[in-house]
From Swiss-Prot:
Represses a number of genes involved in the response to DNA damage (SOS response), including recA and lexA. In the presence of single-stranded DNA, RecA interacts with LexA causing an autocatalytic cleavage which disrupts the DNA-binding part of LexA, leading to derepression of the SOS regulon and eventually DNA repair. This is LexA repressor. Belongs to the peptidase S24 family. The record marks A94, G95 as: Cleavage. It comes from Pediococcus pentosaceus (strain ATCC 25745 / CCUG 21536 / LMG 10740 / 183-1w). Keywords: Autocatalytic cleavage, DNA damage, DNA repair, DNA replication, DNA-binding, Hydrolase, Repressor, SOS response, Transcription, Transcription regulation. The keyword DNA damage applies. InterPro entries: LexA, LexA-like, LexA/Signal_pep-like_sf, LexA_DNA-bd_dom, LexA_repressor, Peptidase_S24_LexA, Peptidase_S24_S26A/B/C, WH-like_DNA-bd_sf. Transmembrane segments: none annotated. Residues 29-49 bind DNA. Its EC number is 3.4.21.88.
Length: 209
């Protein structure tokens, strides 16, 4: 069973999910109570509130009865998300390393070719011009597959010992690691150690003319 969810809350979540799928809108509190054997509407409200608090349900404050099962809720039910998304986790530099951001600021639909691997993907917005020769421009959003190792020459998102992240080509050499920009005017970054957060596998670009 998923963490922070009781058996009764799971029953509430499942009934909401099935009802929304069947009729396009969520059940009433009384319908939920009747379906799972709870006569007290306040008890049902309590379960719904806890499901929201723990991230299994979302409620649109502008619409009455607008409840939506979140990805966390779908995971708790063992249901695969029909519309998987990739979280945008902030900005990473294609220049000097900057502090990494790990909270999602937006979500993008998963391209069809990555649907089977969507849970291992995240996105970052690029700032800087050190990867322009690889076709990665400032303002692009790169798609990154989570992995902790990389072959030489792979474009990666790497984290330094100072917890700063950068987008570069990765090279492990005899006594150091070289993070190589794709810009002839910029020098490589030479480090003793880095943590690879993932491999760049694609990108989105909004400003194509």
């Amino acid at each position: 069973m998923a963490k922070n969810i009781s058996t009764k809350q799971l029953s509430v979540l499942e009934y909401i999910y099935k009802t929304v799928n069947a009729q396009g809108y969520p059940p009433t509190v009384r319908e939920i109570g009747s379906a799972i054997g709870l006569s007290s509407t306040s008890t049902v409200h309590g379960h719904i509130d806890r499901l929201q608090k723990n991230g299994f349900l979302e409620k649109d404050p502008t619409k009455p009865r607008a409840l939506e099962v979140t990805k966390l809720g779908l995971d708790a039910l063992g249901v695969q998300d029909k519309n998987p998304t990739i979280p945008l986790l902030g900005v990473v530099t294609a220049g000097e390393p900057i502090l990494a951001v790990e909270e999602a600021t937006d979500f993008f639909p998963v391209p069809p070719e990555y649907e089977n691997d969507s849970s291992n993907l995240f996105m970052l917005t690029i700032r800087g011009e050190s990867m322009i020769n690889a076709g990665i421009l400032s303002g692009d959003q790169v798609i990154v597959r989570k992995q902790s190792t990389a072959d030489n020459g792979t474009i990666v998102i790497a984290m330094t010992d100072e917890n700063e992240a950068t987008c570069k080509r990765f090279y492990r050499e005899s006594d150091h690691i070289r993070l190589q920009p794709e810009n002839d005017t910029m020098a490589p970054i030479i480090l003793d150690n880095v943590t690879i957060l993932g491999k760049v596998v694609g990108l989105f670009r909004d400003n194509i003319y």
